[in-house]
Amino acid sequence: MRRAPAAERLLELGFPPRCGRQEPPFPLGVTRGWGRWPIQKRREGARPVPFSERSQEDGRGPAARSSGTLWRIRTRLSLCRDPEPPPPLCLLRVSLLCALRAGGRGSRWGEDGARLLLLPPARAAGNGEAEPSGGPSYAGRMLESSGCKALKEGVLEKRSDGLLQLWKKKCCILTEEGLLLIPPKQLQHQQQQQQQQQQQQQQQPGQGPAEPSQPSGPAVASLEPPVKLKELHFSNMKTVDCVERKGKYMYFTVVMAEGKEIDFRCPQDQGWNAEITLQMVQYKNRQAILAVKSTRQKQQHLVQQQPPSQPQPQPQLQPQPQPQPQPQPQPQSQPQPQPQPKPQPQQLHPYPHPHPHPHSHPHSHPHPHPHPHPHQIPHPHPQPHSQPHGHRLLRSTSNSA
């Protein structure tokens, strides 16, 4: 028979698991944080039940507590005194019921009506309260050195890229060019260095001017950049998508140009998603205007460089009058029509043939032979040319007849 987990038996007996095993911190099985910080799980719309009322309803008193202590010894857990009753807001039973609800893991953000609120100890709370005072001073110095202006500063929760996908707080600074993410621990370190520097500066007037070189070490260390500083530049940012409101948080996803998606959440009152979207659109509009101006300037430079190239076509016009003497060979072609009158007398030969025939009748008696002989000698050569004309004339005469 499989033994039930120790945490479940402790819950059945009504004891919070103060020591021993620790459940994984995702999705909603956290019972104790690192450093034994108490974790408060609060269900939306649920009224916190005081610890005294819960013990009365369950009907468990000190007898159950003693049996729980003996059970701890039997289950090989460390024997320890039962602590005092926790504050009324620490409802472990209600929180675990919320964690075991069906569909808790099916939601997109891994939560279903329950929120994890870490309550650090008193010493950590003091440091946490001093974080905002030290953060902007260091961030302002860093931005002034780079020439950027901080438009908004605050704390965002970023989903980690690991297997557990925990929400981690990041000190965020929104500028005109992107979003800076700084871990809070680094700001605490910078704040401690600043406090040491201030203390040394206060001690200097009492000790005298003999130790002016000692504070140089912390001063230089305070100006050192953090080890892990992530910048989400607007040039690599594509859109701000998947805006969802659940409870008091606003969830949104920053989609980068590479296809990477980074999940954030913040209180709804802060409106980080709207500010990031607005600054991203303004940045891209400025870049588009600069691109248009640069193209126009390039075109103007090209137009200014073209006028010196204009005198080049002018010498091309000068060789144009050179082809004018070309018409001079035309008069040489004029003597070509001169041989044309030569064939004219040849063409006249066929024409006189019809004429001598009517006249040959009256003159045929006195001079029948001497005239036809001189004409018959040249006729054999042009006869091929004259035959078509003769036939045409005969046909015309026949038609006229």
UniProtKB/Swiss-Prot annotation:
Organism: Homo sapiens
Subunit structure: Interacts with RPL14, EIF3S7 and PABPC4.
Induction: Induced by homocysteine and other endoplasmic reticulum stress-inducing reagents. Induced by phorbol ester (TPA)/ionomycin, and stimulation of the T-cell receptor (TCR) complex in T-cells.
Keyword Ribonucleoprotein annotated: no
PH domain boundaries: 151-283
Main subcellular location: cytoplasm
Region spans: 15 X 2 AA repeats of P-Q: 311-346
Compartments where found: Cytoplasm; Cytoplasmic vesicle; Nucleus, Nucleolus
Region annotation Disordered: where it falls in the sequence: 39-67, 190-222, 293-401
Expression sites (tissue/organ): Widely expressed with highest levels in pancreas. Strongly expressed by benign melanocytic nevi, and progressively reduced expressed in primary and metastatic melanomas (at protein level).
SMART domains in the record: PH
GO cellular component: a single term: cytoplasmic vesicle
Gene: PHLDA1
Annotated keywords: Apoptosis, Cytoplasm, Cytoplasmic vesicle, Nucleus, Repeat
Residue numbers spanned by region 14 X 2 AA repeats of P-H: 352-389
Positions with biased composition (Basic residues): 352-378
Name of this chain's protein: Pleckstrin homology-like domain family A member 1
UniProt function note: Seems to be involved in regulation of apoptosis. May be involved in detachment-mediated programmed cell death. May mediate apoptosis during neuronal development. May be involved in regulation of anti-apoptotic effects of IGF1. May be involved in translational regulation.
InterPro entries found in the cross-reference section: PH-like_dom_sf, PH_domain, PHLA1/2/3
Biased composition (Pro residues): 308-344
GO biological process per UniProt: apoptotic process; positive regulation of apoptotic process
